[in-house]
Amino acid sequence: MENLSERFNVLQDQLMNIYESAAETLESQIEHWQILRKEAVLLYFARRKGVTRIGYQPVPTLAVSEAKAKEAIGMVLQLQSLQKSEYGTEPWSLVDTSAETYRSAPENYFKKGPMPIEVIYDKDADNANLYTMWKFVYYVDEDDNWHKSESGVNHTGLYFMQGNFRHYYVLFADDARKYSATGHWEVKVNKETVFTPVTSSTPPDSPGGQRDPNTSSKTPTTTTDSASRLSPTASREQSQQTNTKGRRYERRPSSRTRRQTQTRQKRSRSKSKSRSRSRSRSLSSNRRSRSKSRRKASTTRGRGRGSPTATSDQSSRSPSATSSTTSLRSRGSSRVGRSRGGRSRVGRSRGRGKRSRESPSPTNTKRSRRQSGSSRLHGVSADAVGTSVHTVSGRNTGRLGRLLEEALDPPVILVRGEPNTLRSFRNRAKHMYRGLFSSFSTAWSWVAGDGIERLGRTRMLISFVSFNQRKHFDDTVRYPKGVDRSFGSFDSL
């Protein structure tokens, strides 16, 4: 207990020295976050040991200490990466590198130079809202290179330039739906009107604009810090879901037809059974000879009408009907034998003999199934790859057949989130989940059709060899917080 108190007091003294010096260097800010990490680890250890208070300092719960330690580790890694860039020599204060500033809009970016932006709704000075625009925003590109960008404001919202693209982090149209009755607002910078009153329906194709006030909730927005807003990809996913639902509904008539045919076969069997029973009761020795002659005639007619190939095809196509009629005949003959007393054994033996001669053998049925299934094992042509739109069934297909079926529809996972979060997830997956995926794409975004604004959040594609591999990946991998996913497939990768 005394050792914990001494170490905790030492960390507090180091923090006080940093606060009093107020050095504006990245070295000092990295040291500050290192001390905060040590403090969180110490409090976590104390809580594990059952200590609830160190001096006058109450010990937080394990979850709080763990979250603070992880936050400190993440900030140290980001600051160390920034220190290696050309912007590492710039002045950086405690406010610039604080967690609150880092998490404010735009989230997960270092920024400097806050400026207040006032937006007045419905030309009412009392109905106004204040926003913070940052003069400079620092971001990392796909090659882990740091860039410094200037932020700006227009009638649509607040943005910063990411190359040649405008990355909006505040959209005025979103708050106009809450605070405005007419959908009009004006933007003021330093109490000067920069943009005259505009309506949310004026720029229909711009980020945050509306085409119709009744369908405002369905229109895609371009903000990057909100997970609940729809993007163009989300709308396409909804349309794909509706298409797949339509395709699923199309399968039902075929299943109903099979059920109808089965019921018809059952009815015909029951009718034939009743007829055979009535006939078997009134059969005599003369009618036995007639039935034998009829069977011989039907046999000769079947051979004379069609070729042996056609006969074998008919027998293979309708094994159920042949077996049912054969069993009925055997039942009739056996019952006649039983009525005669002494000839009951003969009747039974005749029934068994007819079953063995006329019923289709199970080996023939298996051969026909193998012949029909062997066509699936010849491979998939290049033109057929990606043509399947249904999930592969695991029934009546071997391992090779399933792989060939899955080749028709290469699966992917689309993940959406912040660019830095997706890159970290990609790097972690390459080391921890190797073999569970085929490849990762770079981080990318949609671009407006009539502008250069980036739409929605950053995206990344993950490709797989098969659906089983994608399912195993999705069940095993733990996605970062704020990252959502959706499934899909392509004709080719």
From Swiss-Prot:
Pfam families on file: PPV_E2_C, PPV_E2_N
Region (DNA-binding domain) location: 409-493
GO biological process, alphabetically ordered: DNA replication; DNA-templated transcription; regulation of DNA replication; viral DNA genome replication
Gene Ontology CC entries for this record: host cell nucleus
Post-translational modification: Phosphorylated.
Biased composition (Low complexity): 215-228, 315-336
SUPFAM superfamilies: E2 regulatory, transactivation domain (SSF51332), Viral DNA-binding domain (SSF54957)
Compartment(s) of residence: Host nucleus
Region (Disordered): 196-395
Basic residues compositional bias, start-end: 245-280, 287-304, 337-355
Keyword Glycoprotein tagged: no
InterPro entries for this protein: E2/EBNA1_C_sf, Nucleotide-bd_a/b_plait_sf, Papillomavirus_E2_C, PPV_E2_N, Reg_prot_E2, Regulatory_protein_E2_N, Regulatory_protein_E2_N_1, Regulatory_protein_E2_N_2
Gene3D superfamilies per record: 3.30.70.330, E2 (early) protein, N terminal domain, subdomain 1, Papillomavirus E2 early protein domain
Region (Transactivation domain): 1-201
Any one GO MF annotation of this record: nucleotide binding
Keywords: Activator, DNA replication, DNA-binding, Early protein, Host nucleus, Phosphoprotein, Repressor, Transcription, Transcription regulation
Biased composition (Polar residues): 229-244
Described purpose of this protein according to its UniProt entry: Plays a role in the initiation of viral DNA replication. A dimer of E2 interacts with a dimer of E1 in order to improve specificity of E1 DNA binding activity. Once the complex recognizes and binds DNA at specific sites, the E2 dimer is removed from DNA. E2 also regulates viral transcription through binding to the E2RE response element (5'-ACCNNNNNNGGT-3') present in multiple copies in the regulatory regions of the viral genome. Activates or represses transcription depending on E2RE's position with regards to proximal promoter elements including the TATA-box.
Subunit composition and interactions: Binds DNA as homodimer. Interacts with protein E1; this interaction greatly increases E1 DNA-binding activity. Interacts with protein L1; this interaction enhances E2-dependent replication and transcription activation. Interacts with protein L2; this interaction inhibits E2 transcriptional activity but not DNA replication function E2. Interacts with protein E7; this interaction inhibits E7 oncogenic activity. Interacts with host TAF1; this interaction modulates E2-dependent transcriptional regulation. Interacts with host BRD4; this interaction mediates E2 transcriptional activation function.
Family: Belongs to the papillomaviridae E2 protein family.
Protein name per Swiss-Prot or TrEMBL: Regulatory protein E2
Organism of this sequence: Human papillomavirus 19
Gene it is expressed from: E2
